[in-house]
């Protein structure tokens, strides 16, 4: 089975969000179970620097100008690079300039990505032809539309990592990207009078996946559908929209071999966790108190991530003698809000604005509770890291958070299924109650240890997702 992943990011070479983590793991897990998997990416500077010794597959001119298609390998997986410097040779973020303005030619940059994805199913590389084109998020959404326009020479899958980003462009660009006017209608590319690259992926693909079962349900409701409720509901009712949970790359995120932490540990040998906690407290200049319940949060500082809820309830952590360490950057008013808390409670709350990969690993390893109070969360990875490291996730019941964390009630503790703390409403009072619940169980260290053991015993390795995608591919290939 030959599968081509079409995407715009790849961890660790280029990352702006969780999309990169998925593409840095899923294709490699699929290769391990025997799928002939390749990845198609724009040749951004960071991508090109990380994939050396490429050779030219072909050169061509199309609506996007002169393009060279290159091929190389990265960690054993074949990589196609679209070498078009006039479109992709821009340092930094792949989607916008340093002032956060989207690039004016994004419509063309990502149309080309989809176009090449479709052409690799029809002989652009005479040595390899994709049977399944698997496109990720709006950047790759047009791949399915180009396949449709060519008579569907291969099967197509589209994965929604975040429906909030839709890739909408003015109608007048249609003639510039090689698609016929007849595809611009409500049963096609059109959304609110514009071309929607995301809708193209939804409408023209043989199968659509979301990154968790709960998110696949949520996006059929008005609060989460962003104007696509009718289409998404229809897909779900037709059995063409399913949820497949993301996994954890255990070569990077596992407490027994994490390259970023000093003290390794595992389920049956937990002593290293306490040492990591001491290291983390020292890093943030928090009192070295092993008995203080240490909450950590590694996140973008946005309302979506529930930062405003935490700011409103952090006093509960202080009142109960706990500690809170936060790493992230984002909205200025939220950065200021948490920094003010740290100034007010220096013995209890510490903040680092920015992102630091090594520190994020230490926080997951050294914390007792990892906070993910998101308003919505398609899948979420931090709670999975928390489970893996025995840092109990405290999450809101949404998206992948609802699918992966089991609230610690007397029943679930008794049944050995409890793995963390879950609250229902995106309200400060609900979060406060969950924090109080965590403190109550922290007083019962034997119970806490049982919950931590349950959490660490969960299996969210990528081999599970790889096997589910294999079944999905086989299903559409046999249609």
Residue ranges and their predicted role:
Residues 1-479:
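Catalytic cores of nucleotide-sugar-dependent glycosyltransferases that transfer UDP/GDP/TDP-activated
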């Amino acid at each position: 089975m030959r599968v081509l992943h079409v995407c715009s990011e790849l961890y660790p070479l280029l990352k702006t969000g969780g999309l990169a983590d998925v593409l840095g793991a899923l294709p490699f897990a699929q290769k391990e179970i025997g799928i002939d998997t390749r990845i198609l990416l724009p040749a951004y500077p960071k991508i090109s620097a990380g994939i050396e010794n490429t050779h030219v597959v072909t050169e061509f001119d199309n609506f996007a100008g002169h393009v060279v298609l290159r091929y190389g390998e990265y960690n054993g997986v074949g990589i196609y690079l679209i070498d078009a410097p006039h479109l992709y040779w821009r340092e930094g973020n792949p989607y916008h300039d340093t002032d956060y303005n989207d690039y004016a030619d994004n419509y063309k940059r990502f149309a080309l990505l989809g176009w090449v994805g479709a052409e690799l199913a029809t002989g652009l590389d005479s040595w390899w032809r994709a049977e399944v084109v698997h496109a990720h998020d709006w950047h790759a959404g047009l791949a399915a539309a180009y396949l449709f326009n060519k008579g569907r020479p291969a099967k197509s899958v589209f994965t929604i990592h975040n429906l909030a980003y839709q890739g909408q462009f003015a109608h007048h660009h249609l003639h510039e990207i090689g698609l016929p006017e007849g595809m611009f209608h409500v049963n096609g590319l059109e959304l609110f009078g514009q071309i929607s690259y995301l809708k193209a992926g939804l409408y023209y693909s043989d199968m659509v996946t979301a990154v968790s079962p709960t998110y696949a349900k949520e996006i059929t409701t008005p609060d989460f559908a962003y104007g696509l409720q009718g289409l998404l509901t229809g897909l779900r009712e037709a059995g063409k929209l399913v949820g497949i949970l993301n996994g954890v790359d255990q070569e990077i995120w596992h407490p027994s071999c994490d390259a970023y932490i000093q003290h390794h540990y595992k389920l049956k040998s937990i002593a290293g966790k306490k040492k990591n906690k001491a290291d983390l407290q020292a890093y943030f200049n928090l009192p070295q108190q092993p008995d203080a319940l240490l909450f950590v949060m590694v996140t973008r500082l946005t309302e979506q991530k529930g930062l405003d809820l935490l700011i409103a309830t952090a006093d509960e952590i202080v009142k109960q003698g706990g500690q809170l360490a936060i790493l992230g950057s984002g909205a200025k008013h939220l950065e200021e809000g948490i920094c003010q808390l740290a100034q007010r409670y220096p013995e209890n709350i510490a903040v680092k604005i920015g992102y630091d990969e090594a520190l994020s690993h230490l926080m997951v390893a050294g914390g007792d509770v990892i906070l993910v109070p998101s308003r919505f969360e398609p899948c979420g990875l931090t709670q999975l890291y928390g489970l893996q490291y025995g840092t109990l996730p405290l999450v809101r019941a949404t998206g992948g958070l609802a699918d992966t964390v089991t609230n610690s009630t007397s029943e679930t503790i008794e049944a050995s299924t409890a793995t963390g703390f879950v609250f229902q409403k995106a309200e400060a009072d609900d979060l406060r109650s969950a924090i109080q619940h965590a403190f109550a169980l922290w007083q019962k260290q034997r119970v806490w240890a049982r919950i931590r053991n349950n959490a660490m015993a969960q299996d969210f390795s990528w081999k599970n997702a790889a096997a589910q995608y294999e079944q999905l591919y086989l299903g559409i290939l046999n249609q």
